[in-house]
C-alpha cells in the first residue's frame, strides 16, 4: 500500500534547467521516444517543457509564439516573476485544498509544473507540450499545471507522464486547473505510462 512516511515529496534533479534539447539527460530523450513523440513532432511543437522529478530540466518556446503574447513557462518562474498576480488569482481556485486529502497534500508540497496564458483572440495552430518524468525511487511528484485561455483564443496542450518500474511505491499527485474564457477553445490531451508500483492520484 501507499505509506506516505516512505514517500519523498521533493527530489532535486542532478541537472539544471536547459534551453537546448541536446543538453537534456539521455533518459528523458529516450522516454519521449517511448511515449510515441517523435523528433519531427517535437520540432513542430509551439513549445516544450520537461520536468525530471521535482523540477523542470528543459524549457523552450518558439519566438513566434512568444511574440503573440503567449506565456508558457514553469510554475516557479511564473509565481516569482511578472505573472505572480495572475497565478495568485487562479492557483488552486478550481481544485482547492479542501476538496480531499490528496488535493490538500498537493497544495502543501507542490513543485514544478507549467503555466500557460493565451491572450484574447490568439489562436495557436500547433500544440504546447509538457512532459513529467518521476525517476526517483520511493518519491512523489506534485507538479501543478495552470492554463488560462482568454476570450476568443484557442490552444491544444499535451501532457506526457511516465516513470521507471520499481519494487517500492511511487506517488503521482499532480493537479491540473483549466480556465477557458468566453468563446475560447482548449483541447487538453494527456499520455500516461505508469507501472503497477505507481499510485496515480491526480486532481
Regions of interest found by a model, annotated:
Residues 1-104:
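N-terminal amphipathic, basic helical "cap/leader" segment at the start of enzyme domains
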Residues 58-60, 66-203:
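Conserved beta-strand/loop scaffold segments within soluble protein domains that form the structured core
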Amino acid at each position: 500500500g501507499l505509506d506516505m512516511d516512505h514517500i519523498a515529496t521533493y527530489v532535486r534533479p542532478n541537472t539544471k534547467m536547459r534551453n537546448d534539447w541536446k543538453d537534456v539527460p539521455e533518459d528523458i530523450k529516450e522516454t519521449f521516444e517511448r511515449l510515441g513523440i517523435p523528433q519531427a513532432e517535437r520540432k513542430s511543437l509551439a513549445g516544450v517543457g520537461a520536468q525530471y522529478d521535482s523540477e523542470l530540466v528543459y524549457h523552450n518556446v518558439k519566438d513566434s509564439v512568444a511574440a503573440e503574447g503567449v506565456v508558457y513557462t514553469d510554475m516557479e518562474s511564473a509565481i516569482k516573476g511578472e505573472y505572480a498576480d495572475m497565478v495568485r488569482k487562479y492557483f488552486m481556485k478550481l481544485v482547492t485544498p479542501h476538496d480531499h486529502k490528496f488535493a490538500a497534500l498537493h497544495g502543501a508540497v507542490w513543485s514544478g509544473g507549467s503555466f500557460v496564458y493565451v491572450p484574447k483572440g490568439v489562436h495557436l495552430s500547433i500544440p504546447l507540450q509538457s512532459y513529467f518524468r518521476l525517476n526517483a525511487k520511493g518519491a512523489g511528484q506534485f507538479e501543478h499545471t495552470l492554463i488560462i485561455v482568454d476570450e476568443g483564443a484557442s490552444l491544444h496542450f499535451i501532457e506526457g507522464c511516465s516513470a521507471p518500474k520499481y519494487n517500492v511505491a511511487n506517488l503521482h499527485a499532480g493537479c491540473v486547473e483549466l480556465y477557458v474564457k468566453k468563446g475560447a477553445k482548449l483541447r487538453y490531451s494527456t499520455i500516461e505510462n505508469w507501472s503497477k508500483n505507481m499510485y496515480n492520484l491526480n486532481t
